[in-house]
Design a protein with these regions (language model features):
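Short aromatic-glycine-enriched beta-strand elements
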Residues: 91-95
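C-terminal segment of classical bacterial N-terminal signal peptides
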Residues: 16-24
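Bacterial N-terminal signal peptides that target proteins for export
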Residues: 1-11
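SH3/SH3-like (including bacterial SH3b) beta-barrel domains
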Residues: 65-80, 86-88
Length: 125
């Protein structure tokens, strides 16, 4: 009986240790999306004036809370044909704002550059 308890305890400890090892390795690769967004969202390198853009490609184009694939906002997306305001680029990302024409609600975030066609800058002639 004691041997069975000892074996089960050892197995449980090994399982916990393996889980911690996997999570620890993943945690080292995790991105702090809030910190990355704060570091990349300042106005100092914005397009002046902002650019207008149109969503291209197929299917939903998801918003990201920061310019990194780990920062996807799963419930916020736009679709091809939607118009956006583009504030800046960072690597392969655009910082954009989308205004819902039906509700007037606006959404700001990052989107992959390949999903937006720049139409030109506001006020440019």
């Amino acid at each position: 009986m004691r041997m069975t308890i000892l074996i089960r305890t050892c197995i449980a400890m090994l399982a916990i240790g393996a889980g911690l090892g996997a999570n620890g390795a993943h945690a080292k690769n995790a991105v702090d999306c809030a910190k990355l967004n704060a570091a990349t969202s300042g106005p100092e390198d914005n397009f002046r004036p902002p650019a207008s853009g149109t969503v291209i490609g197929a299917g939903r184009a998801y918003f990201y809370s920061a310019p990194d694939v780990q920062c996807m906002t799963k419930r916020t997306f736009i679709i091809p044909g939607d118009s956006v305001t583009v504030y800046k680029s960072h690597g392969r990302w655009y910082n954009i704002m989308y205004m819902n024409g039906k509700t007037g609600e606006d959404f700001e975030g990052w989107i992959e550059q390949g999903r937006v066609h720049l139409d030109g800058q506001y006020g440019a002639q």
